[in-house]
A protein has these predicted regions:
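Chalcogenol-based redox active-site neighborhoods
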Residues: 1-179
């Protein structure tokens, strides 16, 4: 991971009460959603254009540090259970630094998972371009980002404490609004 010339934001989030540093620009509502290349369970790449189906659908991107932690697992389960609250065509993806094989194991253990699992392990483009890469830990910060069909960011929640959960109701309402 190359981190030269990246913006650093210290104190935007904490880990167990201690300030940590996020790398990359802060995502802002109304800005064009940055590009990314993420890896699926079959090791193929998914880009922003593919996820948005070239402007035919919006995307709800759920960034978690690791599915192997209780809070990340619970968060992913809750979003999976509440997918029906989003009308229309919205791609819903959990993005983590976990290897695709670990993501597949998590899905197998859960059973009926409708979320798309995407890994940022290869080049960290999602974490760095969306300002969610934690310098000290090499994980993604916990965040929910919604990209509208036109490719702009329409919702951002970067959870202030890594061990806390996001606001599910607000995120799902925002996703429904862009569906």
């Amino acid at each position: 991971m190359t981190v030269d010339n990246l913006q650093e934001r210290t104190g935007a989030v904490t880990f167990k009460g201690q300030p940590i540093t996020l790398l990359g620009p802060e995502p802002r509502i109304g800005d064009p959603a940055p590009e990314f290349s993420l890896t699926t369970g079959d090791l193929s790449n998914v880009t922003r254009e593919i996820l948005l189906d070239e402007g035919r659908r919006a995307a709800l991107l759920i960034a978690v540090p690791s599915l192997d932690t209780p809070v990340c697992s619970l968060e992913s389960q809750k979003f999976n259970q509440r997918l029906g609250e989003i009308p229309g065509d919205v791609a819903v993806a959990v993005v983590s630094m976990d290897l695709p094989f670990a993501q597949a194991r998590w899905c197998a253990a859960q059973g009926d998972v409708k979320l798309q699992m995407l890994s940022d392990y290869r080049d960290h483009s999602f974490g760095l371009n969306y300002g969610l890469m934690i310098r000290e830990l090499g994980f993604l910060a916990r965040a929910v980002i919604i990209v509208a069909k036109d490719g702009t960011i329409s919702y951002v929640e970067i959870v202030p404490e890594i061990a806390a959960e996001p606001d599910y109701d607000r995120a799902l309402q925002a996703a429904a609004a862009v569906a």
